[in-house]
Amino acid sequence: MKEAVIVSAARTPIGRAFRGAFNNLQSPSMSSHAITAAVARAGVDPAEIDDCIMGAAMQQGTQTMNLGRQAAMASGLPVSVSGMTVDRQCSSGLMAISIGANNITNDGSSVVIAGGCESISLIQNEHFNAHRVADPLAMKHAPLIHMPMLDTAETVASRYNISREAQDEYSVISQARTSAAQEASVYADEIVPVTAIKLVTNRETGEVTEEEVTLAKDEGNRPGTNIEGLSGLKAVRDGGTITGGNASQLSDGAAAVVLMDGTLASQRNLEPLGVYRGMAVAGCEPDEMGIGPVFAIPKLLKRNGLTIDDIGLWELNEAFAVQVIYCRDKLGIPMDRLNVNGGSISIGHPFGMSGARMVMHALMEGKRRGEKYVVITMCVGGGMGAAGLFEVL
């Protein structure tokens, strides 16, 4: 049976949306930094690449007209390299890798690029096109399908009695883990430094100027975050529990991996990071989309004959602390195996990128720790969960 292995991976640092380093960097260009580095690390001839599959959650503006193809061209790949773009919201990057792997195992591809990108700065702004976004028939059958993500998190908190204190405590741990990981250069093997032209707005005059910046690490971590500071933050909704401190950050970034037929990788004496073993998705009520992983993970494990205890590392996207807590406790995931170097609360969450970032990090960290299996999982906007299984090599 054919296997699809990941032979290389690379990503940009994650920039803060709107005021961060990548607030003026278009998505094909941003993606090209990750793609070019991943291809170079794999040592493949670009002409061998069959397809470039990129995930993006908001496909308009700089991410419209097929980001996958645009990114391939921005990377200087031959015109023979095709491209496609995937939207499964926050699992788009993971979905792209799954599709790429299946192209190898089932359709005969030898080498595929897969990953994801999101520029919140250039899309989620005053130019965002929300014209006729709500379809009346979809709303008839699922009235809450467009419920704001923050409100779905508040629903999970109230419905399942998860306190503000518990959410803040989890967020402190996430920030501390990322801070320690950055101090130890844990993310260095993933990241490619990126130089970009940043827009800087003078708060007093409104004047916008350009500044060349080079970003070499994720911008979002807040070292020294403590429970006293988080507990003092005002909830976004009156009487609510979700704050800017216990929710994921709005971010910009891109990630890419090179997938290869396992036999070909062996013939070339490559040392893959891991092998794709499968993916599962599941739907849930849109108003509690954050708990989606509790439906997707059992599917994934059952299909592969595994249990929770068989998984050495878990990466769960941390859209909100409340949904991580619920999923962790409902499934019995040990905290010492979950988001061991932090997650979207402390690193950032470029929607289309996150799944691909989590895959590469889980495989690299799993290799460092000598683990066999890792699971990447996330809640998905609209009321879904997704989970992917990889074996560390």
Regions found by a protein language model. Give the residues of each.
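Condensing-enzyme catalytic core mediating Claisen C-C bond formation in acyl metabolism
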Residues: 1-27, 225-291, 295, 302, ...
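N-terminal extracellular/periplasmic Venus flytrap/periplasmic-binding protein-like
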Residues: 11, 24-25, 33, 169-267, ...
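Short, well-ordered amphipathic alpha-helical segments that serve as non-catalytic structural scaffolds
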Residues: 27-43, 67-71, 96, 149-156, ...
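Phosphate/pyrophosphate-binding loops at sites that engage ATP/ADP/AMP, CoA/4′-phosphopantetheine
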Residues: 37-50, 156, 160-161, 265-269, ...
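Active-site pocket-lining segment
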Residues: 54, 151-154, 190, 197-200, ...
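Conserved catalytic cysteine-centered active-site region
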Residues: 56-110, 131, 143-151, 224-249, ...
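Active-site-proximal alpha-helical scaffold in enzymes
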Residues: 87-118, 157-186, 256-263, 328, ...
